[in-house]
Amino acid sequence: MDKLMLDGNAVAGLLQEVFAAEMTSAIGSCATCGATEPVGAIHVYRGAGIVLRCPHCDNTLAAIVRDERRVWITFQGIRALELAWERA
């Protein structure tokens, strides 16, 4: 494993804050290769921002940049994201 790479669990807290849902079990499909994986299994790279990549083809699925007051998220490489829906 690349020393700079983490799995999707590394961004679980941030994603839960943004989406108000448990995101590591959400299923994403790659727009490039079509592979489907839970968010917890995707590859995460941290630098000036956070880049989420497909573990099969290395396509950029999403990028996250944040500061003290805002968060910017692009989903350029995700074809679909499936979340469990639990109504209260």
Protein language model annotation of sequence segments:
Residues 42-51:
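Short linker/helix segments within small regulatory modules
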Residues 39-40, 63:
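Short, non-ligating residues that shape and space the ligands of small metal-coordination modules
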Residues 1-26:
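A broadly conserved sequence feature marking short terminus-proximal activation segments
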Residues 12-14, 70, 87-88:
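Basic nucleic-acid-binding interfaces
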